[in-house]
């Protein structure tokens, strides 16, 4: 075998992050909902905002997620918007009572998570927000895709 040149991991990470950012496409933007405006109050719906899927199962579960930032974490860092803290608190309380189901290993992982029911009261309360973000997700792996 010939000589191997060591790879500069950070160079490839930077390129992968650039490709991911440039690969995001907004397909539809009715009523100019995006970008969010400075001062907007945002209601975030969906338990997956709190427990996002960073990769698939099986071999995909071994993906290095050093640079992964969840949607809710990123929104919390955004200084120009405020989040509907009442709604977040409602989700946090519900999640305490309905913990994330991690399953029991290969082939015994739930393909979706239990979601909080949106009562009329919750929806009415969130109507005070300027925008809503609904986060949905389900997992997939080598033994099943959804």
Identify the role of each PLM range.
Residues 1-146:
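C-terminal non-catalytic regions of proteins with extracellular/luminal or membrane-system context
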């Amino acid at each position: 075998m010939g000589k191997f040149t060591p790879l500069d991991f950070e160079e490839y990470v930077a390129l992968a992050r650039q490709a991911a950012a440039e690969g995001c496409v907004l397909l539809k933007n009715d009523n100019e909902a995006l970008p969010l405006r400075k001062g907007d109050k945002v209601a975030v719906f969906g338990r997956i905002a709190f427990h996002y899927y960073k990769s698939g199962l099986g071999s995909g579960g071994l993906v290095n997620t050093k640079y992964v930032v969840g949607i809710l974490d990123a929104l919390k860092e955004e200084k120009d918007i405020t989040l509907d803290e009442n709604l977040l608190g409602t989700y946090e309380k519900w999640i305490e009572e309905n913990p994330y189901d991690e399953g029991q290993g290969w082939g015994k992982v739930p393909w979706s998570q239990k979601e909080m029911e949106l009562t009329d009261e919750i929806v009415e309360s969130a109507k005070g927000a300027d925008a809503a973000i609904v986060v949905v997700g389900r997992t997939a792996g080598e033994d099943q895709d959804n």
